[in-house]
Amino acid sequence: MMPVVQDRKAQICALLKSIETGEPEPIAVFNQQQYIQHNPHTQEGSEGLEELFKRLSQTSPRVNIVRAFEDGDYVFAHTEYDFVRSNIGFGVFRFENDHVVEHWDNIQPRQDPNISGLTLVEGPSEATDHNLTETNRQTVSAFVETVLVRRQFAQLEDHFEGSELIQHNPQLSNGVKAFRAALEERNGAGFTIEYPRLHRVLAEGNFVLSVSEGSRNDVHSSFYDLFRLSKGKLAEHWGTIEDIPPHSAWKNDNGKF
């Protein structure tokens, strides 16, 4: 008999939805003996995942998985969470064989639409151009390393098709000009950002997620940036920024990244 091939994206979507429903079955995708949690606000071993999800479901949450992608042993999802307050988050799950053994995330509060009328989540959700996955990964890696990390802004426009960029950052408007002004700290948006380190780049087709460490207004922060590419150029951008608490406040010792 041939082994059953599990749809990892479907498993993760069911898992995330079980936060809302309290259903215990999707939690079986975790290997709870090997599971490594990188959310510094979550304590390992304090309660089983089944009990945790059941408790969360009693708060009447709503969970909407906007888009999900798969890259080798990784699944990454872009999700709306409504608990006590409304949040937007990226979750990254690493599989070993049939089970999740590691998890990272980056969450920020939902905000009003930006000046271009766009929210943190709307837009295309299905990956295309799967034959270009590695090319697109390299394109985003080069952009992050060159423009965001090394701050070589003269090369920024090389990564876009003319002046076009669909921008979902709540502080920015559409267009490459507004993006460059924000990076150069001359846009009047009231924030400064630095990206000294790129940790991970995940990709499926024309969607690429970069995971970076840096600071916002001199506060240690994590940056998850999702790009949609078209014809080899960056065409659309979503992201979340989350403050990283001081090590003394961490509830596990696994690190944010």
Positions of predicted regions on the chain:
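C-terminal and inter-domain tail/linker signature
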Residues: 1-257
